[in-house]
A protein has these predicted regions:
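N-terminal and secondary-structure boundary signal
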Residues: 2-353
């Protein structure tokens, strides 16, 4: 972890505050101290069951009724039964970076729909959990404020704040930056991990969707900023060697197309996406952001040229080229011309035919 003079001054300020403010003590501990965690084996790369031949499927569904959109998106890529949730410890992981409404955080309606769909397939256990950004800890108040905790409780899921729980230590293979990673035990032990990210721009990581959402499963010592400016974006991809979701259901009801991750310009996109491939998911999300033309960190380069994407491909995390991605779509509204235009923009920006 690179510590600059400015960072040291900031940490000193946090330390002083930590004497008086419990929340600051938690932030300070996450930044400076490694947890007492047992060494575990890094998870294997899960087989993507949501494929058509050699292509990773990415579903995009336009609609108005969130549960129906979520169910349809998952059905389009093969259905929840393909995931093997039955009898498995299942964790739904939204984006709860802090306590602001969507699209800063995942819409609780999407979380509820995903958790309910998983529960209908008979998991051994079901939880909804995340850890907020270090500077906004603790997580529990944000889970409550966003409505995500209530969404989980409504379907009978346990609601977890990872900063309250235990950690394990893993040494991911093939990485350059994230060589020792502390992972929330709940995420490490989940037999089926369903990531429910949002689509948004990001001032440090360029963009945030599938790969970036995994960062909420790791300790403060492993947040991407801990690896310095050069390591920020590649570390996002590398952390997916320590935590490996099995399914991505993306909240695209709104998309942040400028600013982020805390706040920014949001536009209504009215979609849900689903895929088993984080790279395929992210290039499609980038295609959406790029279509609005507001964020230079995305518009200035091709979607396959983003650092997160290049590093993820090198690590074998998913699709490596446009001919390895297939879009499957549905419009439940009966014919939205804006959706037709958006799909055309996505196909052009991702290089799909």
């Amino acid at each position: 972890m690179k510590i600059t003079r400015r960072s040291l001054l900031q940490l000193a300020g946090l330390a002083g505050l930590g004497i008086f403010v419990p929340a600051c003590r938690e932030m300070f501990a996450q930044i400076l101290f490694s947890p007492d965690a047992p060494l575990e084996t890094s998870p294997p790369l899960p087989q993507n069951p949501f494929r058509a031949g050699s292509k990773s499927l990415v579903a995009i569904v336009r609609g108005e009724e969130v549960p129906r959109m979520v169910a349809r998106a998952v059905d389009l890529i093969g259905g929840m039964a393909r995931l093997g949730v039955a009898g498995a410890r299942t964790l739904v992981k939204p984006n709860v970076v802090w306590g602001e409404p969507p699209p800063t955080t995942t819409d609780p309606r999407v979380v509820r729909a995903v958790a309910a769909l998983a529960k209908a397939h008979g998991p051994a256990s079901l939880a909804v959990g995340d850890m907020s950004a270090v500077l906004s800890l603790p997580t529990r108040p944000h889970l409550e404020k966003t409505g995500i905790a209530e969404a989980g409780r409504e379907v009978g899921a346990e609601v977890l704040a990872f900063d309250e729980g235990e950690w394990v230590k893993v040494h991911p293979p093939k990485v350059e930056y994230a060589k020792t990673v502390y992972v929330a035990r709940a995420a490490h032990e989940a037999e089926r991990l369903i990531s429910v990210p949002v689509i948004k721009t990001h001032r440090s990581a360029s963009f945030s969707c599938a790969l970036k959402n995994t960062v909420g499963c790791v300790h403060g010592k492993n947040k991407p900023w801990a690896y310095g400016n050069d390591g920020w974006e590649p570390a996002v991809a590398e952390l997916n060697m320590a935590v490996r979701p099995h399914l991505f259901v993306v909240d695209g009801l709104q998309s942040m197309v400028q600013g982020g991750p805390w706040s920014g310009e949001a536009v209504p996109t009215g979609i849900i996406m689903a895929s088993g491939d984080p790279i395929a998911t992210d290039v499609v999300a980038l295609g959406i952001i790029k279509a609005f033309g507001r964020w230079d960190m995305v518009t200035s380069k091709g979607v396959w040229d983003q650092v997160q994407i290049r590093r993820g491909i090198a690590l074998g995390l998913g699709a490596g080229a446009p001919d390895e991605v297939e879009l499957v779509t549905d419009d439940l509204t009966g014919g939205d011309p804006h959706f037709v235009t958006l799909l055309a923009d996505i196909r052009r920006n991702v290089g799909l035919h």
